[in-house]
Regions:
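Membrane-helix entry/capping segments
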Residues: 1-11, 15, 19, 51, ...
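Interfacial "coupling" helices/loops that link adjacent transmembrane helices in transporter permeases
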Residues: 16, 310-352, 715-753, 810, ...
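Membrane-proximal juxtamembrane linkers immediately C-terminal to transmembrane helices
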Residues: 35, 42-65, 90, 130, ...
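Small-residue-rich transmembrane alpha-helices
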Residues: 32, 36-39, 270, 351-418, ...
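Alpha-helical transmembrane segments of integral membrane proteins
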Residues: 1-21, 285-288, 317-351, 355, ...
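Mid-to-C-terminal secondary-structure elements
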Residues: 120-133, 146-291, 495-693
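Hydrophobic alpha-helical transmembrane segments of multi-pass inner-membrane transport and secretion
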Residues: 15-41, 291-327, 354-355, 435-460, ...
């Protein structure tokens, strides 16, 4: 019996090639979209699950609530936690710290900039990354040891084996380190990102302040990532309930008195499960870009909508096709088929395209996944498709889609009364017609919503990337990593040499590249203000502001003409206690420092340092220029020139001269500093990188939305074919009665235009709410209302045109046909 069902279903599929192709391709694309999202979601929620006992691993994070500044969630915590926490919490089995610092790897006469990660000895025991060479026990227990990833080992040491070989690094001081381990390259699904591991030692963390405190024990900053592992069977709840009190217990009383709030209010601690860091930590700047639940929900919803549209196509086509199979169903009933048998028959006819669509989806995923993985910067593998969970989900999804899509057609067709059908040759019911209209309306509501949302997301992303940040970033390049390792005088000589190069307009130095993330905080005291303030500072060359076309709103800018505009940064304040430094601040800093206006701030002084204070005089105020990450709000900032704090070279060049200027700069840097490997980047590219995730998301949204619209049009094409076939006699009668081809085409187009117009109106409120919520996460956002009004008008035109073009092919064909062929059997 089953073979008969199967053969009949296959014959029906072959007989109706157009509708079969629409169903198979539509369902296949829908299932492929769902499969891609399943793989993406599985990857996003798999972060850090590879570690042994991951359910017992936590990171202690903190939110800095510094008076006068916006709160900032940090992935770091106090270095002193390492010595104090285990003694106060018996549930803590182990604790490790990590900190990343820039330096260079020396090989011959070449110095390659790299990032070094300092960790406590137990780091690779707590986090069991795969080792290629070396033994986990004691791998970083002594000074002079280093662990590399396989990629870095090949890069700096050539082919293995690598164990026991040495690497020369320059950070704080020049030293030769012995390779005690090589790790497999880190997987993509971990929040960690490092290439070199070195043990924390006292020499690296020599006292940096006059008090003798270091990052290892100071409390006025968050220098370390701090991770803990709980003992088996112990809960985090009691520790989470008392961690605020623990911070208050050890936080220095003098600092609490200076800022006027408790330590736990200044740096609010948070215990974050390691496996939740990627998706749920509020930290914005981490080792890797954080995951976004809203993105997963959004793309998951779109893939589901694509599948729903494909299902609607199937239901509409199958129900409409019943008019062409009415006599077949009636004859089957006359020959003895009961309703159950017919129901099974039509459900099998639904399942075959569904599973054919699944095969189509598997092939499509195999072809698309490498590009999708590269574009989303995720390590997704088609091997995951054979995972029992993923495979069972896809097979189950195909089965559910097939059964549900065929449910209504099966119920309608198996319930036909043969006498009525054979007498009238009609099978259409008011319920079926109304359902089809409702489903078409729903399809185009989805299509209209996707068009509106996709266009608004694209407009916002483009706006955020091109918004005026308050400075001229065109025709500017950055050379990273030239500072700190070199003498300040040599750097200034280099700037003078580069200034004379053809195509170069201006050169300056700074401690940052515009568009980068957080900068350094500075503790200071303002006369007449009881509490000490912490504010960001940046080191900039005197001509920095003029190079970026930034003008003061009060006072003047830094200049080489004034000796006080050049400071010297020395770790011990006792050395520079007599120094007076001129600074420029932004308008946000005016408010934080308590001045009523930019003009009032000019010539005012503040004092930095805590033991021997250094006098700083405000000589100028600039607007709230967005030199930091464009994702964050503009905070209060102080600008001064500290020659030994600059790290980056900034060059303004003539238009279209990037290649020649960057090549010439490489030559000059190599001649003066042969060990330095330069990293040159167009400044606009650096700023655009901040929105790479949004660009990827908008492109994927456009791609998925386009798929949904194409599938909807495919379904409408098939439905129009069936609808017009059902109305052939009616059209023939209308032509006999004098209707023109234009009137018949207009009649058919109007039938499909009404649900499209209604669908657009229904979609508008949802789109407004969804886009408005999404825009809230941007510091710079478009004015929604005027854009929304324009886009909804465009969406109406687009959806109507799509519907008309889809239906027009059939409409023009039937309008030109002779009524003789429609009425010859009447």
């Amino acid at each position: 019996m089953f073979n008969n069902y199967l053969v009949s279903a296959l014959r029906s599929l072959v007989r109706n090639k157009l509708f079969g192709a629409i169903n198979v391709i539509g369902l296949g694309v829908g299932l492929a979209a769902c499969a891609l999202i399943i793989l993406f979601v599985k990857h996003e929620f798999s972060y850090d699950n590879q570690f042994t006992d991951v359910e017992r691993l936590y990171r202690i994070e903190a939110t800095a609530n510094i008076p006068g500044r916006q709160s900032n969630a940090s992935p770091n915590f106090f270095g002193a936690t390492f010595d104090l926490l285990p003694g106060d919490y018996e549930e803590v089995e182990s604790i490790v710290r990590m900190q990343q610092r820039g330096g260079t790897v020396i090989k011959g006469e070449t110095a390659t900039p790299e990032t070094f990660t300092y960790v406590d000895p137990g780091f690779l025991t707590m986090f069991d990354f795969d080792l290629i060479e070396g033994e986990r026990d004691g791998i970083l227990d002594a000074p002079g040891m280093i662990v590399l990833t396989e990629e870095m080992a090949i890069k700096h040491l050539g082919e293995g084996p690598w164990l026991g070989r040495t690497v020369t690094v320059n950070h704080i001081y020049l030293r030769e380190l012995k390779v005690t381990g090589v790790l497999k390259n880190l997987p993509g699904n971990t929040h960690f990102k490092f290439d070199f591991l070195m043990g924390i030692d006292k020499l690296t963390y020599a006292p940096q302040l006059a008090s003798g405190s270091t990052d290892l024990d100071r409390w006025n900053g968050l220098p370390f990532g701090v991770y803990i592992k709980l003992k088996p069977g112990r809960s985090i709840e009691s520790m989470a309930a008392s961690i605020d009190d623990w911070v208050d217990k050890y936080f220095p009383a003098q600092i609490q008195a200076l800022v006027g709030i408790k330590g736990s209010e200044l740096f609010t601690p948070r215990l974050m499960p390691v496996r939740d860091i990627h998706m749920f930590s509020p930290v914005q700047f981490d080792m890797r870009p954080p995951g976004k639940l809203s993105v997963i929900v959004g793309f998951g919803g779109i893939s589901l909508l694509i599948l729903v549209i494909a299902c609607i196509n199937f239901m509409n086509l199958a129900t409409a096709a019943s008019t062409l199979r009415a006599r077949e169903v009636a004859l089957r009933k006359v020959m003895g088929a009961n309703r159950k048998q017919l129901f099974i028959q039509f459900e099998i006819e639904s399942l075959i395209p569904a599973f054919a669509g699944l095969l189509f989806a598997m092939v499509a995923i195999e072809l698309i996944l490498p590009t999708f993985s590269e574009y989303t910067d995720r390590q997704l593998s088609s091997a995951s498709m054979t995972d029992p969970v993923v495979l069972s989900m896809l097979v189950g999804l195909a089965m559910v889609v097939g059964l549900l899509s065929g449910l209504h057609p099966a119920l309608i067709m198996s319930g036909f009364r043969p006498g009525k059908i054979l007498q009238s040759n009609q099978s259409e019911t008011g319920i079926s017609s109304g359902l089809r209209s409702t489903l078409v309306l729903f399809q185009f509501m989805i299509s209209a919503a996707l068009i509106i949302i996709t266009l608004l997301v694209y407009i916002q992303t483009d706006y955020a990337r091109s918004v005026n940040l308050g400075y001229d970033n065109s025709n500017q390049l950055t050379v990273r990593g030239v500072g700190r390792q070199q003498e300040a005088e040599s750097l200034e000589t280099l700037t003078n040499v580069i200034t004379k190069l053809p195509g170069v307009r201006s050169v300056s130095l700074s401690s940052f590249t515009p568009g980068d993330g957080p900068n350094t905080g500075l503790s200071l005291r303002v006369p007449g203000v009881s509490e000490r303030l912490i504010i960001f500072y940046r080191s900039v060359y005197p001509r920095f502001f003029s190079q970026f076309d930034v003008q003061p709103v009060a006072g003047r800018l830094l200049s080489d003409e004034f000796a006080g505009d050049r400071a010297t940064f020395v770790a011990n304040p006792n050395v520079i206690q007599e120094q007076q430094v001129n600074v420029v601040i932004n308008e946000a800093a005016v408010r934080i420092l308590g001045f009523g206006s930019p003009q009032e701030a000019i010539s005012k002084v503040y004092y930095r340092g805590s033991e021997n204070e250094i006098t700083s005089t405000i000589v100028g105020v600039i607007p709230n220029v967005h030199f930091g990450s464009p994702r964050a709000q503009v905070d209060g900032e102080i600008y001064m020139y500290l020659p030994d704090q600059v790290t980056d070279l900034l060059v303004s060049f003539d238009p279209d001269e990037f290649q020649s200027v960057s090549g010439a700069i490489e030559e000059k840097v190599a001649a003066m500093f042969p060990r330095i490997q330069t990293r040159i980047q167009h400044l606009q590219d650096n700023i655009a990188d901040q929105y790479r995730e949004e660009k990827v998301q908008s492109t994927l949204l456009a791609m998925f939305s386009g798929l949904a619209i194409v599938i909807a049009c495919m379904g409408l094409f098939g439905l129009a074919s069936l609808t017009i076939a059902r109305r052939t006699r009616e059209i023939g009668v209308r032509k006999v009665m004098g209707a023109s081809s234009r009137e018949i085409v207009a009649l058919l187009l109007m039938q499909f235009s009404k649900p499209v117009l209604i669908a657009n109106i229904i979609a508008w409120p949802f789109c407004w709410y969804a886009v408005n919520q999404w825009l809230d996460r941007f510091e710079y956002r478009i004015e929604l209302l005027p854009w929304f009004l324009g886009i909804i008008l465009l969406a109406i035109i687009a959806t109507l045109l799509l519907a008309w073009v889809t239906v027009a092919t059939h409409a023009f064909k039937v309008s030109r046909a002779s009524p003789i062929f429609a009425l010859r059997y009447e």
